[in-house]
Amino acid sequence: LDNRPVNDLRVEALADSTGMNVLLPPEDLYATRLDGQTTNANGTQYGDTHALLQWVLDNEDACDVLIVSMDQLLSGGLVNSRWEDGTDLTWEKDAIDTLSQIAARKPVYVFDTVMRLATTAGYQGLDSEAYRLFRSYGMAERGELTGHNLTVDNIIAGYPYGADGERIETTLDDELVEHYLAARARKLRLTDYLLRHAESFAACVVGVDDSAARIS
């Protein structure tokens, strides 16, 4: 997911305790840097997705099993997956296809997440108030979709609207809201594509981050 100790140091320690040898990419390739921290070598606050995929390819033969965070590989980390809003997903889909091909040769375990309600405070200029506002906005109940209406495109089209069909009100800047919704759309499309390849992998696990017990 990123370079927080629970995601790398503790994983290595746990593996060592069982006699397993874990290979991790250089930290600079997967580190998340908050505002005010020194950026990675690629000049960003997030991991280097292209370099990470190349690292996987270069080290495939040295591994018996691959365990891959899709948020890291496709978005440069969990935090950036809540911010990245690109619409051209050609490279990301090709990366999933590449993992599927590797999975035909050895076990590949992939882990993904459903994007949480809020963005991250202290990242890309967002603060705790933005976190609160985004969480409230994301928690608003949306309309229910069933049957043939339950499609990725329809889910995305409904993001700006509440269960009553009216646009959800917020004091957030319109540009920030559009960015947030675009990030959600991107994340959903990538998870949908991943799940369509789920049978290729030894396991495909999708975790649910901060969420609401309603259609949101």
Segments from the language model and where they lie:
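An N-terminal assembly and electron-transfer interface module characteristic of large anaerobic redox
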Residues: 1-216
